[in-house]
Amino acid sequence: MNPEQFTESLQQALQQAQQIAQTRRHQEIGVPHLFKFLTQPGELVRQIFSEAGADLDQLQTELDRELDDIAVVSGGNVQYGGSMSSSLATLMQAADAKRKALGDDYLATDTLALALMDQTGDQLTKYLNQQGITAGQVKNAVDRIRGGQRVTSRNQEDQYQALEKYGVDLVKQARQGNQDPVIGRDEEILDVIRILSRKTKNNPVLIGEPGVGKTAIVEGLAQRIVRGDVPENLKDKTLFSLDMGSLIAGAKYRGEFEERLKAVLKEIKKSDGQIIMFIDEIHNIVGAGKTEGSMDAGNLLKPMLARGELHLIGATTLDEYRQYMEKDKALERRFQKVLVAEPSVEDTISILRGLKERFEIHHGVRIHDNALVAAAKLSDRYITDRYLPDKALDLVDEASAEIRVEMNSNPTELDQVNRQLMRLEVEEAALKKETDDASVKRLADVQKELASAKEKQRTLSERWDSEKKSLQALSDKKSALDKAKHDLENAENNYDLEQAAKLQHGTIPKLEQELKAMEANDHHEDWLVEESVTPDQIANVVSRMTGIPVAKLVAGEREKLLHLADHLHERVVGQDAAVDAVSDAVLRSRAGLQDPNRPLGSFMFLGPTGVGKTELAKALAENLFDADDHMVRIDMSEYMEKESVSRLVGAAPGYVGYEEGGQLTEAVRRNPYSIVLFDEIEKAHPDVFNILLQVLDDGRLTDGQGRTVDFKNTILIMTSNLGSELLLAGVDDQGHLSADTHQQVMQLVQSRFKPEFLNRIDDIIMFTPLQLGAIEEIVVKLIDRLSARLQDREITLKISDEAKKWIAKQGYEPAYGARPLRRFITNHVETPLAKEIIAGRVAPKSTVAINLMDDHLVFENQSTQPA
């Protein structure tokens, strides 16, 4: 008996049997050790005994009992599992003799099962015979699984029933009702049927973007085969979906994958055209299993495809078809393309309506029709990097799951009562320990409140339980109706007219009537739990997925938006025109009035340095997102050279940094609802403006990897110092800009930027130099910020009007704007104050007054001692 003639599975089984012997400290490997492993899930021998009629759980128990009866050996020099027992050696010799009789080249595990049944003296054989398992039954099971094949390779066990092992019968799935209905793809299904009916090149390949429904078309074909709604040449055909993952998984040795695929193809060939094979992600077969000197899977398929022995349906995406299939012209030639386009919003709504019942039954919720319409429309508008109907189905599924989770959690009212109960019980326990009159009186009040809260809790709990039971009953009734409809379909397909009539005129109308009555009796408006999916829930899911505020405005948000201009004015002083223009753009967008194909707003801020251009962008970000760093800031001084322009959208293929993506496109792809600030735009290379043209006009930009990035939910702000000298000189005492200056600045802008760029910007806003009154307000804001930093030390700052005016006058330089103020306050307020704190003259919990004396600032400590 040569171990080289053992199959891989048998060699592995012997190794595992040795491990079992070592774990149990048995000196020899016996029959129970080997069969303990061979009857594990996934093993061939387990399948053989199962088909022969053995109770596998009881068989495992019997093997454990036999293993427990073997004596445990202990000692220093004992080699556990080092040799075979005489019974196992006899079994192996008998199995080898049977191998020769069967004409097998290798000894396989199924031959071992056949040989075991001939060992009448073995304990395991006796047990199987007692259970009614005979040698004939085991042989029949082996013959069924082998399908007339001999063992000619070391991996033969992997090749038995290859289609069942590596594929899924889609027609069987459809017959059992395990597939979702396919709606609105009749044209593509008919194309597939036409191609399958051809004499040559009868292999369709479905090509389309991910999520458009390629696999659904194949499932639709399977459902048509079940209904008999196909030409005669396709009736009674079987449609198998090949799982390339499980076919490749575990193929350790060269040639093992090819052997498995050959076994699948052999079964298909034997079926004499009755099996149609479907390979999803068919591009994987190009190059699969290819190593140096070997063929890939695609080359194994070519001869059968050419001779018409294999009917194959493939599915792949446009990019992968181009990348893999088109390179192999011989393989591509054998397929006929069927292009699967993304369905329209209207078609998607029809698909969602068709699947509505399936979602309702699965989640146990009610889905409103307007929620389906919202899912199709909102996903089409806001989720731009995916395709319909997949993204719309995701929204409905996610919203339904959210409602289901809420239904299984305590309602808010009940939760509040439970918390109140806990608080009162803690208070009652504490008061019981007190004896004074006030505590006794309070205890009586607490006990009354406790009794009332317990009654309320009981009422709410009963109401909630009743609602849950009602929902479950409704869900069960829907499931029963769905099953009855599926049974009717099967009865009609099988021409069981009596059963069909019984279902159509008896069971189904009765269930529909009961369901209608249940829905009419439930008054959902006063329920504790929300059990229906509405457009609001869909909008919330979109907001969570994209970060774009799609949901209806709640009262607090309305108030916030109506006062957006006021909040911006508080932070940005002296620039009313700019603040109003930006806040109006935001209001238009949130009211849904802006052009859906352009950014929310695009502005160019012109003005001298330090007048609030960048500050306004930060203030807007803070008001919209509650954080002023929630914006994409691009410093255009970094894009002065032609070579650096590509960094915005990402390097072209073949260049360093191609995989990283662009600094602008990646930032907006991750945060589609954001403010994009192009700081110092005039410093950028002219090529940058060419990139921005399509962003400003169509709200989209294609990055270096060919992906389209959506800018329709961004506010674009460009700042520039162009015409600063003119703006500084052309302002009157009240801070108003003269018409001549305005015209001169616009001429300067037009000479610097191309007309097609300027024409696409919503508004060009000129920031005027700050007046003294505005500077005084800024001083107060800067002192307030300093005061906020001192709050940790519990130190309060106060500033007198004289000090404020003096700082404004001394620290402001019109040419430099408000920025020198910060430096002035750092030198004249922060530094002296820091010295006072370090010296211990300003203690915590004290108030420091900043006053003006003899043309310099003085700090007066108004100490407040702790109470």
UniProtKB/Swiss-Prot annotation:
Keywords: ATP-binding, Chaperone, Coiled coil, Cytoplasm, Nucleotide-binding, Repeat, Stress response. It is found in: Cytoplasm. GO terms for cellular component: cytoplasm. GO terms for molecular function: ATP binding; ATP hydrolysis activity. Residues 343-547 are annotated as: Linker. Residues 393-526 form a coiled coil. Residues 3-148 form the Clp R domain. The keyword Mitochondrion does not apply. Transmembrane segments: none annotated. Its main location: cytoplasm. GO terms for biological process: cellular response to heat; protein refolding. Gene3D superfamilies: 1.10.8.60, Clp, N-terminal domain, P-loop containing nucleotide triphosphate hydrolases. Residues 770-867 are annotated as: C-terminal. InterPro entries: AAA+_ATPase, ATPase_AAA_core, Chaperonin_ClpB, Clp_ATPase_C, Clp_N_dom_sf, Clp_R_dom, ClpA/B, ClpA/B_CS1. Residues 6-70 are annotated as: Repeat 1. Residues 84-148 are annotated as: Repeat 2. Pfam families: AAA, AAA_2, AAA_lid_9, Clp_N, ClpB_D2-small. Residues 161-342 are annotated as: NBD1. It comes from the Bacteria. Belongs to the ClpA/ClpB family. Homohexamer. The oligomerization is ATP-dependent. The Clp repeat (R) domain probably functions as a substrate-discriminating domain, recruiting aggregated proteins to the ClpB hexamer and/or stabilizing bound proteins. The NBD2 domain is responsible for oligomerization, whereas the NBD1 domain stabilizes the hexamer probably in an ATP-dependent manner. The movement of the coiled-coil domain is essential for ClpB ability to rescue proteins from an aggregated state, probably by pulling apart large aggregated proteins, which are bound between the coiled-coils motifs of adjacent ClpB subunits in the functional hexamer. This is Chaperone protein ClpB. It comes from Lactiplantibacillus plantarum (strain ATCC BAA-793 / NCIMB 8826 / WCFS1) (Lactobacillus plantarum). The lineage of its organism: Bacteria, Bacillati, Bacillota, Bacilli, Lactobacillales.
